[in-house]
């Protein structure tokens, strides 16, 4: 959801990364399908 909601602002990757960090991951990014992908 973070990738779609903020895609127009450029903040979508930051929101995705923050979401992943909160889940204990090392960050994340939005893929080509606007899905937030967390790094392990």
UniProtKB/Swiss-Prot annotation:
Function text: Antimicrobial peptide mostly active against Gram-positive bacteria. Active against Gram-positive bacterium M.luteus and also against fungus N.crassa. Has no activity against Gram-negative bacterium E.coli. Active against M.luteus and, weakly, against E.coli.
Name of the protein: Defensin
InterPro entries referenced in this protein's UniProt entry, alphabetically: Defensin_insect, Defensin_invertebrate/fungal, Scorpion_toxin-like_sf
Listed GO biological process terms: defense response to fungus; defense response to Gram-positive bacterium; humoral immune response; innate immune response; killing of cells of another organism
GO cellular component, one term: extracellular space
Family, per entry: Belongs to the invertebrate defensin family. Type 1 subfamily.
Species, as recorded: Calliphora vicina (Blue blowfly)
Source taxon at top rank: Eukaryota
Alphabetic keyword roster: Antibiotic, Antimicrobial, Defensin, Disulfide bond, Fungicide, Immunity, Innate immunity, Secreted
PANTHER family named in the record: DEFENSIN
UniProt cross-references to Gene3D superfamilies, sorted A to Z: Knottin, scorpion toxin-like
Disulfide bonds: 3-30, 16-36, 20-38
